[in-house]
């Protein structure tokens, strides 16, 4: 009997999901992306060689794994082609292992133009999007004017639909934002030029996954971004445009939720956030500099510097609730090496002086709270590359145990470096 495992981020993204997906796919037959787009940045390091994937599932580096892009993903054909070319140059076979849902909404050049124009218009209230058209593409989907991958396979109908949607977006660009219009003919020609190539990879994803489940295959669902960026449950409006939580698996792939066996939440040993938005445990001091420098905290997609802070157990408890986490993978433990003390946020002090252990429902509430910390001794020993609990310094072991106690959730996997080998699995999600 196969296992169906979800791997997702529990914080504001950048938790190290790509590495863990790559590690676990040694036991999986299928890896499925179910939300987001090429705003994701999943970094894999294998034998010292770094690969950054934005759209293609991280299982692509395992020769025996089929990679699926589900209907919940907004797909930029040009970005997909670039990523495929990059992988092929490295000798990674792609076409016979990458499968795509025809129902994926398309990201086209006008989506990117609107995204950039909108961020510019927001001024100092900008959300900090990647500028890759993710939000506008999801807007088109919800408004029922969006174009999907399957539309490309009828050139005449696609041209008509494209003309209509571009009338709307070009009007917004020129009349509201004062930006340049996007050329219709160029957009049409470029999109149709990729139609046959995309068609060769399209399948009925729901049917394929159901057949794989019935055949007893192991399936891994790969989340992008993180729980606190979820459009419904995150620090709204400083969020992404998709459901990054476990509930997004079913809607974004057509896989029945009752068939999910294990949900693994990826959590850094501290917290980071990239872009704008509230961040109660943010450290704008030497310790923050230590975390940012030692952790190489720069966005894999945008290159922007990430904002570091202490581990936020209040936010983590909400992530555990929303996702029904089975277990946690703790990453970047080694980044805490050399600190005299480490802190865990165990509560939020509100303006009236009361302390809560429940997260606010919107960004404004986060901005009003002050973190309440529990302080533990740090450690000077090196944990980089350690692959068993008995090799860790006692202070690091105590930190891990205390996190488990506070969160009431087991830490089943621990990562102590960027390479797939710098990890130890205490409990495997597939066993």
Swiss-Prot record:
Q: Which SMART domains match?
A: Adenylsucc_synt (SM00788)
For this chain, one GO molecular function annotation is:
adenylosuccinate synthase activity
Name the chemical reaction catalysed here: IMP + L-aspartate + GTP = N(6)-(1,2-dicarboxyethyl)-AMP + GDP + phosphate + 2 H(+)
Sites where the protein binds GTP: 13-19, 41-43, 306, 332-334, 415-417
- What Gene Ontology terms describe where this protein resides (cellular component)? cytoplasm
UniProt: Mg(2+) binding residues? 14, 41
Tell whether Glycosyltransferase is among the UniProt keywords.
Answer: no
Q: Which InterPro entries match?
A: Adenylosuccin_syn_GTP-bd, Adenylosuccin_syn_Lys_AS, Adenylosuccinate_synth_dom1, Adenylosuccinate_synth_dom2, Adenylosuccinate_synth_dom3, Adenylosuccinate_synthetase, P-loop_NTPase
Q: Identify the EC number(s).
A: 6.3.4.4
Active site: which residues? Answer: 14 (proton acceptor), 42 (proton donor)
Share what the entry says about its subunit structure, partners included: Homodimer.
Q: Where does substrate bind?
A: 300-306
Please name the HAMAP family in this protein's record: Adenylosucc_synth (MF_00011)
- Could you tell me the gene encoding this protein? purA
Give the record's pathway.
Answer: Purine metabolism; AMP biosynthesis via de novo pathway; AMP from IMP: step 1/2
User: Tell me, what does this protein do in biology?
Assistant: Plays an important role in the de novo pathway of purine nucleotide biosynthesis. Catalyzes the first committed step in the biosynthesis of AMP from IMP.
Which Gene3D superfamilies does the record cross-reference, listed alphabetically? Adenylosuccinate Synthetase, subunit A, domain 1 (3.40.440.10), Adenylosuccinate Synthetase, subunit A, domain 2 (1.10.300.10), Adenylosuccinate Synthetase, subunit A, domain 3 (3.90.170.10)
Where, by residue number, does IMP bind? 14-17, 39-42, 130, 144, 225, 240, 304
The molecule here is called: Adenylosuccinate synthetase
Keyword Acetylation in the entry? The reply is no
List the subcellular locations. Cytoplasm
Cofactor-binding details, from the entry: Binds 1 Mg(2+) ion per subunit.
Q: Which UniProt keywords apply?
A: Cytoplasm, GTP-binding, Ligase, Magnesium, Metal-binding, Nucleotide-binding, Purine biosynthesis
| GO biological process terms, semicolon-separated | 'de novo' AMP biosynthetic process; IMP metabolic process
């Amino acid at each position: 009997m196969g296992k169906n495992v979800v791997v997702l981020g529990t914080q504001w993204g950048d938790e190290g999901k790509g590495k863990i997906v790559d590690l676990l796919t040694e036991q999986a037959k299928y890896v499925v992306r179910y939300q987001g787009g090429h705003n994701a940045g999943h970094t894999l390091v294998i034998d010292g060689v770094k690969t950054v994937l934005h759209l293609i599932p991280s299982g692509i580096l395992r020769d025996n794994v089929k990679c699926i892009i589900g209907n919940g993903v907004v797909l930029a054909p040009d970005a997909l082609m670039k990523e495929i070319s990059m992988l092929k140059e490295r000798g990674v076979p792609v076409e016979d292992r990458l499968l795509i849902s025809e129902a994926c909404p398309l990201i086209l050049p006008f989506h990117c133009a609107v995204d950039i124009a909108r961020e510019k218009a927001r001024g100092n209230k900008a959300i900090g999007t990647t500028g890759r058209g993710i939000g506008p593409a999801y807007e088109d989907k919800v408004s029922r004017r969006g174009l999907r991958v399957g539309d490309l396979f009828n050139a005449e109908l696609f041209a008509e639909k494209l003309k209509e949607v571009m009338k709307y977006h070009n009007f917004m660009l020129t009349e509201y934002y004062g930006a340049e219009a996007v050329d219709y003919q160029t957009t049409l020609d470029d999109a149709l030029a990729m139609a046959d190539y995309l068609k060769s990879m399209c399948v009925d994803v729901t049917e394929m996954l159901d057949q794989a489940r019935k055949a007893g295959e192991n399936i891994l669902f790969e989340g992008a971004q993180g729980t606190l960026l979820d459009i419904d449950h995150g620090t709204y409006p400083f969020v992404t445009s998709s459901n990054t939580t476990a509930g997004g698996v079913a809607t974004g792939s057509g896989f029945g939720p009752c068939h999910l066996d294990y949900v693994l939440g990826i959590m850094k040993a501290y917290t980071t956030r990239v872009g704008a938005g509230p961040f109660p445990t943010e450290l704008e001091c030497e310790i923050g500099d230590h975390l940012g420098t030692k952790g190489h905290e720069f966005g894999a997609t945008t290159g922007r510097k990430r904002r570091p802070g202490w581990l936020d157990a209040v936010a983590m408890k909400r992530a555990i609730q929303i996702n029904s986490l089975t277990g946690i993978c703790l990453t970047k433990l080694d980044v805490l090496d050399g600190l005299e003390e480490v802190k865990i946020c165990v509560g939020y002090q509100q303006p009236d002086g009361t302390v809560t252990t429940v997260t606010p429902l919107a960004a404004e509430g986060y901005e009003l709270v002050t973190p309440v910390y529990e302080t533990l001794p740090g450690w000077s020993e090196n944990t980089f590359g350690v692959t068993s609990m008995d090799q860790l310094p006692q202070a690091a072991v105590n930190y891990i145990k205390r996190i488990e106690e506070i969160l009431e959730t087991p830490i089943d996997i621990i990562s102590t470096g960027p390479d797939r080998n710098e990890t130890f699995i205490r409990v495997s999600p597939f066993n």
